[in-house]
């Protein structure tokens, strides 16, 4: 009894620490008038506008994205030269003709490829969304041969024009726009009270579970995933998860397509109308509590209703929403969108319904995986409770569906490895269906099918093994060729780079064949430079676009707890131990090679030194295989510590949520 009281006191202390941390930030940031970035130019691979010679004027027009603009920032490049001169910077509201600010810049103060910030007079910051601004930079004087330049993007990414001496130029000036945060002290207190209510509820659940005695480990996961997932679902603004907006747009296209809607003929020739596209593009503003204000304003409106004057936001918007991806990974979202449209839900209600169904399906898939696994249950639970996976399950990301299917496939494979009787048709059909769905959604997970090569031969009925492999490989290959035909075409021809400038040449298979040593070097450079970041980000070191970065100590805590979950207890016996380890390691290495190889051919420029587009979350579906491969027999734990590991994951997630509450409450 004394030990339990000590545990409760310790958890209560952590609870009070979290409340104090949230309250402190709520009080301080309510008084300091903090600002946040609301729009920026993605200047990846940026170039200059040309030397700013005396008399040169560079102007960028941009539409207002927020009512209360407080600051702008322009990115300059000095090319390593010291310039003794002056620049004039002005900001004009072209709609009203009002000058919002004039500034003089000494070029000696500029930092190479750094942003120079310009504060706007507080009396002139109240704008309207239909206002057009013009940012002009002119060179007043400069020392000869030592000129500076303004960084610009190679593509048109803003809704405006870039001109040099009134001559139009491609791309856009590298800018950042800021607004004042309007989340006052009283609202912050409400936010803190909501956080406290959650933490008290969670603590009550924790106490009830431990007072009730020993329960199955799978129910621990169901309760913890449910509580934590719902918190992430409502605490993180819509579209704050990586690529969430893009996936929601594709799901919306699929919903229109499956309900027999004709494609829109015109600029985009898609299954989204201009009104639908405008609503989605409007939601791409950097997520913050301003997003909640938009939601509140449009919560009762008809589906995808937008302001009449917002269609200028379509200018230059080249967001890809074609239903070229398989619909399987979007199934929960498609169902939610179809239901929402049928009953007339508003845009944001549809978004949250899609999030909720995605969360529900993912949780059921992981729960099913944990239920059928004969061992490694705690390992699967630990990875499923990482902050990154929790963020994905509570968003519209299609990665959550793929992750759930991959975990279920691995769980069923382990069950078949341990099975003593002959395999039934349903046993093998389940594996075939799961790997078909996984490979159709993301082909670089296709190596998972090789796990079945380790299945004991004696468990197959006579003649079944050969037929099993034919039934296995044929649908997987056909699924990849059909659903990913556009991607395969781009990879084979090198005609497109997914996350870059389509005008730049991408890597092709021909480059791989002609320069194998360079490709090997790129693989090693990528892993050596970014390997640690891939691991940390897979756990949750960077959550979405909100710059939520939990402490490195917490990330190491998640990794350490996951490693402990692999160590067997003394009373555990192993069947096919060495075979499982070897095949798991081989499939993991091959999967990593396929992931990086696919991104090499689809997202990497010919001039790049490392492979582009690789993200830590791509490795999560195959990470259990690495952990199984690292499992040994020599190191053992005296008794089962599964419940203690679950408690560790709960405490670590509690501390991460303190960070999430703290960062969200200051925005």
Outline where the language-model segments fall.
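Beta-sheet-rich sandwich/jelly-roll-like modules and their strand-loop junctions
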Residues: 3-6, 10-95, 110-115, 122-130, ...
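Membrane-lumen/periplasm interface segments of multi-pass, membrane-embedded glycan/lipid transferases
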Residues: 185-188, 483-570
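Transmembrane-helix motifs of polytopic, lipid-linked glycan transferases
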Residues: 205-206, 352-375
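Transmembrane-helix signature of polytopic, membrane-embedded enzymes
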Residues: 216, 345-348, 367-387
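Interfacial juxtamembrane loops and adjacent helix segments
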Residues: 258-353
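Membrane-interface alpha helices of multi-pass inner-membrane proteins
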Residues: 391, 427-443, 448-454
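Short acidic/glycine- and proline-prone juxtamembrane loop motifs at membrane-interface regions
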Residues: 395-402
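Perimembrane helix-loop-helix junctions
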Residues: 412-422, 446-477
